[in-house]
Amino acid sequence: MEQELIVMEIICNACEARSLCYEALRLARTRSFEQAEEKLCQAKECLNRAHLIQTQLIEADQGEGKVPMTLVMVHAQDHLMTTILAQEMATEMVALHKHLAGEEAKCLEMH
C-alpha cells in the first residue's frame, strides 16, 4: 500500500475514534452509560487499528529513516496521539458521570 494511503488509514481511524469518544461523553451526560461504554469500546478498536499501522511503519523504518517523513505523516501522528489522550480522558469522564449519578441517586433516596 502506498505511504499516503497508509497514513490516511491512521488519520481515518484516529478521527473515527475521537468522534466515538465525544459521542460517549454526550451519552454519559444523559446517563446512557451502557451506550457510552459501547462507544468507548468502539473507539478503542479504532485506536488499536491506527496503532497497529503506526507500529508497522516504525518496524519498516527500523530507526534508519527508511520511511520518508512527510507533513501528512506528522499530521497523522498528531491525530493519533491527541486521540489517545481524548480516549483516556473520555473513559475517566464517563466513569465520573457514572459515579456522580450514583451519588445523586443516594441523595435522592435519603430525602
Tell me what each language-model feature is.
Residues M1-H111:
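Terminal alpha-helical segments
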